[in-house]
Amino acid sequence: MVSRLSSRLQALASAPCRSLSCAQDVLHRTPLYDFHLAHGGKMVAFAGWSLPVQYRDSHVNSHLHTRQHCSLFDVSHMLQTKIFGCDRVKLMESLVVGDIAELKPNQGTLSLFTNEAGGILDDLIVTSASEGHLYVVSNAGCREKDLTLMQDKVRELQNKGSDVALEVMDNALLALQGPTAAQVLQAGVADDLRKLPFMTSAVMEVFGVSGCRVTRCGYTGEDGVEISVPAAEAVHLAAALLKNPEVKLAGLAARDSLRLEAGLCLYGNDIDEHTTPVEGSLSWTLGKRRRAAMDFPGASVIVPQLKSKAQRRRVGLMCDGAPVRAQSPILSPEGTVIGAVTSGCPSPCLKKNVAMGYVPYEYSRPGTPLLVEVRRKQQPAVVSKMPFVSTNYYILK
């Protein structure tokens, strides 16, 4: 399975918005690069960065450890930006589908950059920081595209007299994910993490490092946090977290299978510029006020799809036989090609093959029997609800 996952990560690296140079010496390095090597990290090229695909543990053991305890991921390759000024919400709402104005202080939301054709340019998390700015985290592979999009809008508003401004952060970003993540982190912070629910954040001192923004979110389906930490303190913080026996380092392979079990999209594979939020089963990201106003890019395409139903839909698949990979054809029970897989892997938790892909709307109901083609052989699949594995986000009741 490890070799199969390594092959899969190489495929992900060549996906749209994830182009890489072939020369290892031109790859970006996170502040934890030497730390990874010292801890046995197997480094690979991903989205223009040198990142660990796994450590000494097998991919499966790392995956299961995250589900049962907690793991530390280096996600410093992600683009972190701050947007300042009285028009910061106006700027962001001119680019995304979400209702940013309704966010409470230190509340965040997953949103989507869209184009005028309704296609998804990237997915991102926007937090309304109580310090008076928006904190934005978006994909490394779309860094230049996202920066151009935001910087062009900044200049447009500034030319009209706005005080809006954008700052690119050089912080590292560490993700501590798993059911014991909060317990581990609580030992190093004074703030009561029981008061920090899913998709909220706070600036706090973490294991002696001041100025860290801790956000209760992640890409695994488990409870956990992402910690934006000054780059010079990243190694100190990672080492402090690893002193707890609950914590192990994890890499890209585990992160990919964890997010797939959780039914989460990978930009460039499962969603892209040719996919609308409705087609991608992401209609929930569309703010109610924004739908009514139809004032976001691509609204004239996206909003009508909410009523008329998009012609195709992203679905989950449970598959028999050999593991299913991206671009594997999806067929009707009669053997007609009707779509394609966008992500797939053996699920370490379910011990079954899981995948997601696009099929015509009439084939999207859970329980619908289909076929997938792997190495020119057809094998059974069934449309399944996502997430495949129940999520465990920390939500206050």
UniProtKB/Swiss-Prot annotation:
It is found in: Mitochondrion. Keywords: Aminotransferase, Mitochondrion, Transferase, Transit peptide. Its EC number is 2.1.2.10. Signal peptide: none annotated. Residues 1-22 form a transit peptide. It is an enzyme of class 2 (transferase). It holds the Pfam family GCV_T. GO terms for molecular function: aminomethyltransferase activity; lipoic acid binding; transaminase activity. GO terms for biological process: glycine catabolic process; glycine decarboxylation via glycine cleavage system. Substrate binds at E226, R255, Y393. The keyword Cell division does not apply. It catalyses: N(6)-[(R)-S(8)-aminomethyldihydrolipoyl]-L-lysyl-[protein] + (6S)-5,6,7,8-tetrahydrofolate = N(6)-[(R)-dihydrolipoyl]-L-lysyl-[protein] + (6R)-5,10-methylene-5,6,7,8-tetrahydrofolate + NH4(+). One of its GO terms (cellular component) is mitochondrion. Belongs to the GcvT family. The glycine cleavage system is composed of four proteins: P, T, L and H. The glycine cleavage system catalyzes the degradation of glycine. This is Aminomethyltransferase, mitochondrial.
